[in-house]
Amino acid sequence: MSFNKVPNIPGAPALSALLKVSVIGGLGVYALTNSLYNVDGGHRAVMFNRLTGIKEKVYPEGTHFMVPWFERPIIYDVRARPYLVESTTGSHDLQMVKIGLRVLTRPMGDRLPQIYRTLGENYSERVLPSIIHETLKAVVAQYNASQLITQREAVSREIRKILTERASNFDIALDDVSITTLTFGKEFTAAIEAKQVAAQEAERAKFIVEKAEQDRRSAVIRAQGEAKSAQLIGQAIANNQAFITLRKIEAAREIAQTIAQSANKVYLSSNDLLLNLQEMNLEPKK
């Protein structure tokens, strides 16, 4: 069969040219689309090149260009994130302590290429658990169990200092370190509760003693006042019998007021109200 005898199709060259343009255009759009990548807010990127490896440049937020097939961006979140760890260890006086720690951690932005080379993308899971557990064991072992309670702030500062130094060796920054929980064994907890009860009982006994002392002093002062009052009354009676008469009149007034306010009816002599007022001697003693 001879292909020279195949008739020419009208418009075939134009169709072929259009197909070529479409293919080239599609490849161009695909290449352009795969040549751009975005770095979101709070993130940074490093570039891996198949020929040269990791580049030293750190790419900030925004849209950036890369060579498809040859380059691949690795994007890191550089915002501080909380990391929680609980560890059980022994104190200086051999008490078991369960301590919880919360750290705010982030990668150092200018050290991302080195972080990727040595630790990869899951840097926090590879570094933080080990250095946190080791630091907690080392610091807690320096304190007695009671000191961990009374000197909690100092313990937290020491843990933060050591952790910050150790994390910086792996290009990781720690913005905050705080102790969240501190739990002791049953025996130590029972001893603490018993000590608190004893302290409360001691305070209560001290209060009772102080109150008894105050009552004693009040009784002495009251007795001294009554003795002085009796002495003054005796002197007044000795000097003037009218003092007794005055006291009788005051007593009669109180009796009359009480009877007047009472619901019961009482009949008394209007002359002396049963107090022999008419027989009173108002003349001063000579």
From Swiss-Prot:
Positions on the Mitochondrial matrix side per record topology: 1-13
**Recorded superkingdom:** Eukaryota
Identify the keywords attached in UniProt to this record, alphabetized. Coiled coil, Membrane, Mitochondrion, Mitochondrion inner membrane, Signal-anchor, Transmembrane, Transmembrane helix
The question of whether Amino-acid biosynthesis is a record keyword is answered with no
Gene Ontology CC annotations of this record = extracellular region; mitochondrial inner membrane; mitochondrion; plant-type cell wall; plant-type vacuole
Tissue distribution of the protein: Mostly expressed in proliferative tissues, including vasculature, shoot and root apical tissues.
Q: Tell me where it resides.
A: Mitochondrion inner membrane
Q: Which residues form a coiled coil?
A: 186-219
Q: How does it sit in the membrane?
A: Single-pass type II membrane protein
Which loops or segments lie on the Mitochondrial intermembrane side of the membrane, by the record? Answer: 33-286
Which Pfam family would be a valid example here?
Band_7
Against InterPro entries, the record matches this protein to: Band_7 (IPR001107), Band_7/SPFH_dom_sf (IPR036013), Prohibitin (IPR000163)
Q: Where are the transmembrane segments?
A: 14-32
Q: Which family does it belong to?
A: Belongs to the prohibitin family.
What PANTHER family does its record include?
A: PROHIBITIN, PROHIBITIN-2, MITOCHONDRIAL-RELATED
Role = Prohibitin probably acts as a holdase/unfoldase for the stabilization of newly synthesized mitochondrial proteins.
Q: Tell me, how does this one assemble? A: Component of a prohibitin multimeric complex in mitochondrial membranes.
Protein name (database record)? Prohibitin-2, mitochondrial
Q: Which organism is it from?
A: Arabidopsis thaliana (Mouse-ear cress)
Q: Which gene encodes it?
A: PHB2
